[in-house]
């Protein structure tokens, strides 16, 4: 226990009502957040002589101050606890590292509805289907739906300004509601209804309706229409045959847990209308000495009660671990959702199969993660030995990317003891320098990155500069001039020059811009971690540069073609459904646009291709 903190005096001031408490260390940092039905009883338990675990002993030894917030109910306390955990990220709490919102498929409420991927708040009028585990799953589903039920996926701004159908109509991926007469209101509405039923898991209803329409078309001797509907039926059947479907039409999340060597994996399986939409593995940050029960309880609370996660609530949550606060969690989630949410820990039948699947996936993902961590730990230990450092807890690497000096982008990637910390990767757009001056670009990004206050935990042990002596000289100059409140002498600056022909294993490392560098053996674990972070930085920089270049190119390509002024540009984009449609068009198709001659069409075609 802290010698300064007077626990007896503090406990006399604490109420027995429900609430949340925050524990601070001597530096004023929140080190733990907890909730309690009875604050006095819960807080008193921290200051007994026989504490439950070493983790609690270590926590109590650092307490300098405790803040208490009284709430009306336990539910309020639970919500506030998880909001505080998200805000303060205390080191003695189990922390959910991935707090991204989940993507949904959005069916708009327009006269002619469109399909799109959606993340975030659901303000737009329409229907939302999901959640899906990631953007890839949504894009894959949208592409599939476009082939089976060709309703539009274009933005409203494009849809409203069309006078002729775009390429999607020509290849059968859209019914073309943007142009009057191409599709009847009845047919478009019918296809939208099929999409709605399909995404709701009612495949049987879709097939029943399609079969009835096919038979009617055949009876009416409309054989082309019957053949088209037959193809649609076959496409729906092919999709549904591949899916693992429960006849019960379950709407639930299934959570499996694996715990080993101080690391936990929580695997969440998303099931909607009996269909497995996908899954995702999470590796929460677990303080040493934490029991598995606390890991599961804290994860589940953070997963559903923090921010956007509240909008992804299913009707039922299956767990393979019995929670002490199961009733409280279910009540809190039900209150948030405005409907009853069930939390089940002993399922049977299909639900037990789901849980076994989630548990197996959690165990498999944990084995893979532990193997990867073992590798990265060995590599960082080897690098620390080479650099004569006690340990490397954080490392950052910089790279510059541009095309002939244009659209310069600098990247910064971050590794910690577990490897890449992608949530902290950053890109910097570089401006105000001579085009192609990589030294000036490096100088600028380092000043922007380090010329300000930095939390102690965010100060890197090693800063890797990709580019060799010249770039390292820039880094040394920047750090020599820094006037910052943190210890600028803490990071070790290390330059890395690529080998001959940029071959991996031939890199040269530099501590100083002058003199000879040194190399590591090609099989050195220390070299492997340097190559890993350098390649990550390089890829991150190139990715940002390509996005920036594409953005500029999309707005300026047509402007550079002689004979294509604002009116012709507008006409070309309008008739071709945007720049991508124009890029895919032939010379003959471009020449059909009003005001575009055969000669100009050829010039436009070759300008876009080359």
Curated annotation (Swiss-Prot):
Keywords: Cytoplasm, DNA damage, DNA excision, DNA repair, Excision nuclease, SOS response
Keyword Lipid metabolism attributed: no
Recorded superkingdom: Bacteria
GO cellular component, one term: cytoplasm
KW DNA repair (keyword) present: yes
Xref: SMART domains: GIYc, HhH1
Recorded family membership: Belongs to the UvrC family.
Protein name as annotated: UvrABC system protein C
Alphabetized GO MF terms: DNA binding; excinuclease ABC activity
Residues annotated as domain GIY-YIG: 16-94
Organism encoding this protein: Salmonella paratyphi A (strain AKU_12601)
Subunit structure: Interacts with UvrB in an incision complex.
Localisation per UniProt entry: Cytoplasm
Function: The UvrABC repair system catalyzes the recognition and processing of DNA lesions. UvrC both incises the 5' and 3' sides of the lesion. The N-terminal half is responsible for the 3' incision and the C-terminal half is responsible for the 5' incision.
Gene: uvrC
Gene Ontology biological-process entries: nucleotide-excision repair; SOS response
InterPro entries recorded: GIY-YIG_endonuc (IPR000305), GIY-YIG_endonuc_sf (IPR035901), GIY-YIG_UvrC_Cho (IPR047296), Hlx-hairpin-Hlx_DNA-bd_motif (IPR003583), RuvA_2-like (IPR010994), UVR_dom (IPR001943), UVR_dom_sf (IPR036876), UvrABC_protein_C (IPR050066)
Pfam families, per the entry: GIY-YIG, HHH_5, UVR, UvrC_RNaseH, UvrC_RNaseH_dom
Span of domain UVR: 204-239
